[in-house]
Amino acid sequence: RRRLRLEALLGFRRTPTQSTPFFRRFKCAALDGHPTPMTPFVPVATGASGVGDTSAVGLALAAMDVFGPQGPRIHILEGEGGMTAGRVHEALATAATAGLSNAIMHLDWNQASIDSDRVTAEGDKPGDYVQWDPRELLYMNDWNLIEAGDGSDFKRVLAAQKAALSLDNGQPTAIVYRTTKGWKYGIEGRGSHGAGHAFCSEAFYTAVEPFEAAFGVKLPRFEGEKTPDRVEAAYWETLLAM
């Protein structure tokens, strides 16, 4: 709890804290902008763009060395925006050249970043960031490529993942899912990046109605003054209801 990061000491990153009851009770620490091993069940740092790919390929290389081709698989979750970093291109080339057949990348291709709704090229339309589409990049680097299509169709997702597990040609595999950023949340595309509905607003409750209907629960509604303690208590009650 006394640990500070260099960027915080230099003033480049705001590391918030608070004295609300649950924050103190559970000895919480503020989350980073990207998940890191400080967060339970996160084995490697995931950001900035592409950092997690290189770490995951390193894990796949180590697993292949220790356990061989029949050992554990390393599943890599990525988006097309994260693939624009040069370090990712090096990782893709390394994985293919080393024959890391235990590496499976799941690519969430939604074309939306913090400031663009067309990150990569697609068809005859140029990209705002890069002029390839992720399928081309993966194929060019000699990865097996599986197109799942609609990433919100669980049957297609499952079929693609079963297909990936059936491949046995000594190369890494990538599955590309076409998705919509902010799907069914009411804020789509780049506008949903780091954004959400106002605290306990009507738009928020509208967004969670399908969840309430599917599971037969009613999430708590907040009323009154939005003090830090009461807001924290509302979040806690909502988590318990879920």
Locations of the language-model features?
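Conserved acidic/glycine
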Residues: 46, 82, 86, 104-106, ...
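Cofactor-binding active-site loop characterized by glycine-rich and histidine/acidic residues
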Residues: 1-98
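Short coil/turn segments at beta-strand junctions that form active-site/ligand-binding loops
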Residues: 70-73, 101, 169-172
